[in-house]
């Protein structure tokens, strides 16, 4: 009998199992294949704060994601690395000041400590602009992170097991019953 059961050994299943086991629950995590074999192994491998959600005024969501990104960077620096991205500006899409404002918020909503801040680029003079098409003259460079997603899943599952979770791989869940 378990206090909680997780079906699926991806990042969500392993992370929830780790959290539940860490709170003292008796937990079972079962995965039909191997850990991180499904959706988690096909991710974009970014630990990002959800920059695009600022456009929909999802400030709290972005703040929470940025805070968690910082937590992950501190907890697992051996598998999470900073990455810089160049975003060419196209005046037809939105004004440069609006993009810069969004990136300013992205830099500051989560209390960023480790990553460098956004900077405005002259794409014709800045080396970062070299691979960008000539039609773009202005851009922005901002930070996010890259993660070894499979290792993150496995580390969560191992920690869950160390906290008492029973982790079963190659074990499909064929039925479950909830008992009150």
Tell what function each PLM region has.
Residues 89-168, 175-179:
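Flavin (FAD/FMN) cofactor-binding and adjacent substrate-gating region
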Residues 1-4, 19-23:
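Extreme N-terminal leader/targeting segments of oxidoreductases
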Residues 45-127:
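Dinucleotide-binding Rossmann-like beta1-alpha1 core, especially the glycine-rich loop
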Residues 17, 21-22, 159-161:
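Gly/Ala-rich phosphate-binding loop of Rossmann-like dinucleotide-binding domains
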Residues 1-12, 28:
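Beta1/beta-strand and adjacent pyrophosphate-binding region of the FAD-binding site
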Residues 21-42:
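Glycine-rich FAD pyrophosphate-binding loop
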